[in-house]
């Protein structure tokens, strides 16, 4: 995932910051508790494609943060 892209992407619902989960290939919105999939390197920023994220899930500390 390109760091420049991570800096500008926001949650489509709340416009909040997203956190990259490298292991799961997802962008996590902690405010809405949603995880947006990344498919073939492309973030799918559609609410219908998001899944409920797991509270307290540990995100890869080596992954770049956009917060």
From Swiss-Prot:
InterPro entries documented for this protein: Trm112-like
GO cellular component: cytosol
Record field: transmembrane: none
SUPFAM superfamilies: Trm112p-like
Homology family: Belongs to the UPF0434 family.
Protein name according to UniProt: UPF0434 protein Reut_A0592
